[in-house]
């Protein structure tokens, strides 16, 4: 909210860092301290009770460091934070991340006042502050983090960024999404938002060339009119998970980050009013849809084709298509006749196309015929084959993934695969899906909603004909 410094790149690519409360014992801050001190980032540990940490000299105070410091990360007990913020401002840092919890969210007057004093410091200085009660920033492009991210397990080349008011939940988002082979560009956790808020970060990510899709976990907003103004200017798709729909949930928010949730109906109206802003129901849905935006071309129309190995699941997809106002594509007769030429006579070749057991013999040819049909704008692939035949016959999936990717690129039509069965079957796809950039999910409703949001975005004035592929 501090309007004096709007370029927040020092949070994501700091030239120099001080960790106040740096630790070499197993407590909060240990993992970050160990990682940053052994990274290429110029990092200085500060701890009044230590002389050496992981072989590095420790400073008693940030002002004992002779070199300039761009970013201060604070991980000390809450009663010490205010003085350390003052010390950091005196040092001339550009940014402060306060990871410590225990402020306004406690409801305790003493800690509410401390947070208010920190907020005043932010307003009256050129220092930008994230937090308190957060885990800060992760930049997957340069591998900078103030959290506990394991870059050895993360997916490289992602273009999805996360803004989360919750700290730990931000890490959980990354961990789950990584297991689904969904890659990220940046994650930002804001906590109690004494200064930097979701609006500041939306503006930053809008300018960020490595971010194509923005996701937000939101509890409450302090600057409503400014948020609306920002929504008008954004040109990238934004997926929002806003909690506090119920009265119980709204009350719980205040004790979590100290935010006021507000009337959920107002939020709902605002989200629906602006193109490119889409509300989701849970984080699984949010990141499943985000990966479709990040990896697939936008559809030119709303006609959806389905290839399935289960007729029943194909029918369920039809229900979702109608419910969301999309259309089941009517295949040209020439397309149907082409598929008849290589398909067993018992297959159902009208959309949804049910290939049944012939899936592995006829899939690629059927896929090509359907995607080349001018009546088809997008394709849902439903895979429902048990583990046993896949494992017994060592059936490869990569030729199908490769063909899906090649045709999607060539014809500029999005494809989503929904996998049904055991975790083994899902992993059978996931271990190859990132290479071919085919979104893999387990919920048909998420896939159809992704097509719906992408179709709406393609019609909006925010679609600048940008290719949103990773």
Tell where the protein language model's regions lie, with residue ranges.
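Catalytic-core regions of core metabolic enzymes
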Residues: 1-470
